[in-house]
UniProtKB/Swiss-Prot annotation:
The keyword Lipoprotein applies. The keyword ATP-binding does not apply. It comes from the Eukaryota. Pfam families: wnt. This is Protein Wnt-7a. Belongs to the Wnt family. PANTHER family: PROTEIN WNT-7A, WNT RELATED. Transmembrane segments: none annotated. GO terms for molecular function: cytokine activity; frizzled binding. GO terms for cellular component: extracellular space. Disulfide bonds join C3-C17, C5-C12, C81-C112, C97-C107, C111-C134, C130-C131. Keywords: Developmental protein, Disulfide bond, Extracellular matrix, Glycoprotein, Lipoprotein, Secreted, Wnt signaling pathway. A lipid is attached at S9 (O-palmitoleoyl serine). The lineage of its organism: Eukaryota, Metazoa, Chordata, Craniata, Vertebrata.
Length: 135
């Protein structure tokens, strides 16, 4: 919730508040954590009904229904490491990666355990002091 005060010279004679979403980065972390803990489910049909009546977690001997806060999926995600024309995935072969990064752009994760080739580049740049031009 965010609030803003209204009044003469900064006095808070009237206060207006409204509900806001969390910061985008925080929301991204929440969704990523949910994705890591997502549970596979399967639809269960009632004996007389043709439509699925509820979802249950897909594990042997498990009859627990997912909680309202669970992120659920019915089919597993495709393997994004390999090229798959059916899903439109180009795979990760030949992609540039960051050897020192620990997240998704890091070579260990992006190259899917296939290894990677390293190249070292050297560039010479002319230094330019910004925003000052002496007479």
């Amino acid at each position: 919730q965010e609030c803003k005060c209204h009044g003469v010279s900064g006095s808070c004679t009237t206060k207006t508040c409204w509900t806001t979403l969390p910061k985008f980065r925080e929301l991204g972390f929440i969704v990523k954590d949910k994705y890591k803990e997502a549970v596979q489910v399967e639809p269960v049909r009632a004996s007389r009904n043709k439509r699925p009546t509820f979802l249950k977690i897909k594990k042997p001997l498990s009859y627990r229904k997912p909680m309202d806060t669970d992120l659920v999926y019915i089919e597993k995600s495709p393997n994004y490491c390999e090229e798959d024309p059916m899903t439109g995935s180009m795979g990760t072969q030949g992609r540039l990666c960051n050897k020192t990064a620990q997240h998704t752009s890091g070579c260990d994760l992006m190259c899917c355990g296939r290894g990677y080739n390293t190249h070292q580049y050297s560039r010479v740049w002319q230094f330019h002091w910004c925003c000052c031009n002496c007479k």
